Amino acid sequence: MKKIIFTLLITIVLISCTTDVDNGPQYQINTVPVVLDAFPTKFAADSVTEIPMKYVLPTNCSDFYNIYYLKNVNTRTVAVQVIKDSQKNCATNINVSTVSLKFKPTFIGTYHFKFWKSTDAAGVDTFYEYDAEVTH
């Protein structure tokens, strides 16, 4: 009886192990430059302001993924992230898209915004930078 149970267990273990590799879609997340038509110079405390950001999807296989948003005291670093299927042959895209950053200030004072625009030759990120006052 022990031999039968042992044989069944070994058979189940061997059948359940597979060497198949999932070659499903593989995705890449990239940051793309942000362009602002205008930036508000004042915000009201505890109210939500939408800041429209324009960006270009690099290929026809790319799609909006996320708004990168980092808070550091009064500085806000913002970037647009896109996702791309890296296993497809993709054509270059020139269509401009828009996404809005919903900003709600939490204190009265000056906020400093940094919107990502590129990485320079030395590998350092560069930004469009704006200051805005929060009153009342």
Each model region followed by its residue ranges:
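Bacterial Sec-dependent N-terminal signal peptides
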Residues: 2-35
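First exposed extracellular module after export/assembly in secreted or surface-exposed proteins
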Residues: 26-136
